[in-house]
Amino acid sequence: MSQLNVDLQEIAKFEALAAKWWDQHSEFRPLHQINPLRLNWIDERAGGLAGKKVLDVGCGGGILAESMARRGADVLGIDMGEAPLAIGRLHAQQENVQNIEYRQIPVEELAQEQAGQYDVVTCMEMMEHVPDPASIVKACQTLVKPGGHVFFSTINRNPKSYLFAIIGAEYVLRMLPKGTHDYHKFIRPSEMAHDIRNAGLTLKEMTGLHYNPITKRYWLAPNVDVNYMVHTIKTGV
């Protein structure tokens, strides 16, 4: 287990909260609130999800994965926490969403099994929870087909992101449990771009995800000071 690109403490945090994953008033409320934004952003840039084979890396309980399946994609969600995966399977069964599967497997291992098998790969709100983000990016590049799309999201590392993503979200607004994020694992856009280039992906777009605590509204804008999303493609034939 020590050789895997996994932080066991990170896995344990989300395992402990697994039963609340689909409760829109729980600690996962922010994920439910941002999901329509990120789903539409991915859908538009991928040229539509319907009929495509999609992999969601670090899927947790399946909020994004299931919503992509509802758009008509054939989805595999992978995670290293078994409890969230069990919640995802149960929810899909209850909602009769049949075009989705879940597996407990490291993305690097799946890349050895299924290289070039996916039209779209998503890895959202996960990069800042692993020891080696570059390894995740490379595995995603391996898994996507030539011409396919890979999407990432994470949190910038700077004083503003510390103030907003940790002090604000975890301590002041209490949107997230204390200890959800480790500032030192946040990833600057320049670092993300470096890993993307090294993996052989082409960076197409970065956009910021913003939140107003007064209006409780989320929106997308060019500023990537705190939360941001990335669209890449795998060029070649």
UniProtKB/Swiss-Prot annotation:
GO biological process: methylation
Gene Ontology MF term list: 2-polyprenyl-6-hydroxyphenol methylase activity; 3-demethylubiquinol 3-O-methyltransferase activity; polyprenyldihydroxybenzoate methyltransferase activity
Alphabetical keyword list: Methyltransferase, S-adenosyl-L-methionine, Transferase, Ubiquinone biosynthesis
Cross-referenced SUPFAM superfamilies: S-adenosyl-L-methionine-dependent methyltransferases
Catalyses which reaction(s): a 3-demethylubiquinol + S-adenosyl-L-methionine = a ubiquinol + S-adenosyl-L-homocysteine + H(+); a 3-(all-trans-polyprenyl)benzene-1,2-diol + S-adenosyl-L-methionine = a 2-methoxy-6-(all-trans-polyprenyl)phenol + S-adenosyl-L-homocysteine + H(+)
Keyword Methyltransferase tagged: yes
EC nos: 2.1.1.222, 2.1.1.64
Pathway: Cofactor biosynthesis; ubiquinone biosynthesis
Residues that, per the record, bind S-adenosyl-L-methionine: R38, G58, D79, M124
First-level EC class: transferase
Similarity comment text for this entry: Belongs to the methyltransferase superfamily. UbiG/COQ3 family.
Its biological purpose: O-methyltransferase that catalyzes the 2 O-methylation steps in the ubiquinone biosynthetic pathway.
Protein name (Swiss-Prot/TrEMBL): Ubiquinone biosynthesis O-methyltransferase
The species this protein was found in: Acinetobacter baumannii (strain ACICU)
